């Protein structure tokens, strides 16, 4: 069942069966990616493809994030693979719920709200037992690449194992103190540039600076001449995981046609290493970065996306400041724009 939400010229759709947001349009822009096989019958009927991949689109909430080698859920957990229950949906806001029996009947409530250029989400997690990883999973596609900007990070790292063996640009199992990752060929890659000219499948984890009160990632798309700003509460989501999917997956349903895609996956996890590893002492927990969320109490996870036209000449953000209902975006040149943003969302 598809639920429509509207505010002014903004329109979003929540797919209750898939748990994702396959449509978000605002001002003629469509910031989110939709997999090309989403409506292909042969993929939808394939029992070997997880539901989250069959209906891959937009943004969805993963719990647990990635591999669940504790409870045995499919990749990204029941919140990304099982139907949601609608509690209320009217106008610009929808509220939905999902229950996780294998995690002590933990309940996840999802609130989606459209306000101007922003798509706001809150996830309220209640009850349950044990520890769990989680992350948002918004995806954007770039026809001709783009430029990325980030809030301050104190580390960048890659997983010990590749997403698709032999198809990674970045060297495995590295930890860096800047945004320049070592590559398999001995060179370096600036994470602020999407690797549009490389057929690769890559993944890295960025660790938020300790003093950040607002975490953000900005993608400026070249061909589309727009920008997507993704905002997070860094206290709840101390890492940003970047998924690069640019044609390297040559097996069904991907078949080398999933190109130019970037996942901006803010959450609490040990990269792509699975729930069991995240629940143990690990290299992130050694940095005092939590990699799991303890169930059994109420947690509120706040996230937002803002879609804007890219001002002429802009290529990189140097700062994003939220104050009194206004987001101020500063470009590397010093130029600024102010964008209204709902007060209280990140309080």
What is each PLM-predicted segment?
Residues 124-128:
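Asparagine-centered strand-capping/turn motif at beta-strand->loop junctions
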Residues 1-120, 131-347:
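Surface-exposed acidic/polar loop and edge beta-strand patches at domain peripheries
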